[in-house]
């Protein structure tokens, strides 16, 4: 479940990624829009791991505002109000509850922390053109400021934009174990902030008695 959770929560990472130093005009404009908006999008992904010839695939939807977010994909729901994160597996009837870590080593698996501390999370190392989904796109290549040593930590990130625009169309995430996830983004929308944090908070009373809840707070 751990790798699947990382894949799903990493989707919100597509909205994070900048650095304290200089950045490309495209990335800077995109981040400015993200920081001032309620952002929603749909995604699909494929993940290739070194140990397997087959690919893991999936799809889902995301809604994010500041340090709060909701993700629904591959049978998992992830709710975060900026303080507590719930991961719900409806099929297995399992729930994991965690506090949002404030330490820097939480960046790799905590998209909310990446966004709330966006200036500390990534450095943009290059910006240019690339091929994505058979089309020429603009590509921003980023590396974590604080590189984790775990095999599940993020080694690198690429954000792909429609050529000449700030429209995010996809991303590529590489983990230290050599796994590569490729995301396609659709239905990206920016609306005025305004949702209460409570709307991103999971109501544990909705879980049935059959659920196994692991509380790590």
Enumerate the predicted regions with their spans.
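An acidic-aromatic
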Residues: 61-109, 181-182
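N-terminal leader/targeting segments and the immediate start of mature chains
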Residues: 11-55, 202-217
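Positively charged n-region of N-terminal signal peptides that target proteins for export
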Residues: 1-4
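One face of beta-strands
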Residues: 39-45, 56-62, 67-71, 155-157, ...
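Hydrophobic lipid-interacting interfaces of membrane-associated proteins
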Residues: 48-50, 76, 178
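Extended beta-strand-rich segments in extracellular/periplasmic secretory proteins, especially
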Residues: 114-176
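Non-transmembrane domains of secretory- and envelope-associated proteins
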Residues: 23, 148-156, 163-217
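Beta-turn initiation residues at beta-strand->coil junctions
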Residues: 47, 73, 89-91, 172-175
């Amino acid at each position: 479940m751990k790798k699947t959770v990382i894949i799903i929560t990493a989707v919100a990472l597509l909205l994070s990624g900048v650095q304290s130093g200089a950045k490309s005009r495209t990335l800077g404009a995109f981040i400015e829009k993200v920081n001032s908006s309620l952002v929603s999008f749909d995604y699909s992904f494929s993940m290739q791991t070194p140990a397997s010839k087959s690919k893991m695939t999936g799809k889902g939807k995301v809604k994010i505002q500041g340090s709060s977010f909701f993700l629904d994909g591959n049978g998992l729901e992830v709710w975060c109000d900026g303080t507590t994160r719930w991961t719900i597996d409806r099929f297995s009837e399992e729930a994991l509850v965690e506090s949002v870590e404030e330490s820097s080593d939480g960046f790799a698996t905590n998209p909310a922390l990446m966004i709330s501390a966006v200036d500390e999370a990534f450095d943009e190392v290059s910006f240019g053109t690339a091929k994505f989904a058979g089309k020429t796109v603009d590509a921003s290549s980023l590396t974590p400021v604080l590189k984790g040593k775990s095999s599940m930590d993020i080694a690198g990130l690429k954000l792909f934009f429609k050529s000449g625009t700030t429209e995010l169309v996809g991303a590529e995430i590489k983990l230290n174990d050599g796994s590569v996830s490729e995301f396609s983004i659709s239905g990206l929308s920016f609306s005025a902030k305004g949702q209460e944090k409570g709307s991103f908070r999971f109501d544990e009373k909705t879980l049935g008695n059959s659920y196994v809840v692991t509380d790590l707070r």
